[in-house]
Amino acid sequence: MLKRFLTVSLCLLLTLAAAAQTKKTATKKATAGPAPDKAYLQKIWDGWATLDPANTAKFYATGPHTFFDIAPLKYNSWDEYENGVKGVLAGYKSAKFTVNDDAAIHTEGNLVWATATVKDEMTNKSGKVEMGAFRWTVVFENEDGKWLIVHEHVSAPLG
């Protein structure tokens, strides 16, 4: 009798444990439009090459949780970022940016993150040409069918 009770109890316990398990289902929303690709990344930098942040605004989310990493320490919105970067870009008369072939793009539902190195060539107002390369990491979120930047980080090697 004890053996039968233990067997039934074990079966009941296993049944309850199995029923308590919730099946994980994908909660990703269907995304409208193709995810960003290298050409899309290049369009962003072509916008920056105009030296007018208004030409890149369409690529950026405007919400309060958007992150940009250029001096000062942080910006809390696209408006703050746009105003701050105007001062930096005012010292230049031309720019060209090229997203290199090492661009890597990863899609997960309504989020995309990408990394790339970007070649830059900028001419300041006095005519001095500055050339280099930097690292770019960017996170996009699909908002109403548009892939918008919600987090961006740019850095250059020391030295």
Predicted feature residues:
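A short hydrophobic beta-strand element
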Residues: 109-120
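Short, low-complexity N-terminal intrinsically disordered segments enriched in polar/charged residues
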Residues: 21-62
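A short acidic/glycine-rich loop-to-helix N-cap element
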Residues: 125-131
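Short beta-strand edge/turn micro-motifs at domain boundaries
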Residues: 133-158
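Bacterial N-terminal signal peptides that target proteins for export
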Residues: 1-9
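Beta-strand elements of well-folded, non-transmembrane domains
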Residues: 120-124, 140
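Hydrophobic h-region of N-terminal signal peptides that target proteins for export
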Residues: 12-19
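A solvent-exposed, acidic/Ser-Thr-rich amphipathic alpha-helical stretch
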Residues: 35, 53-108, 131
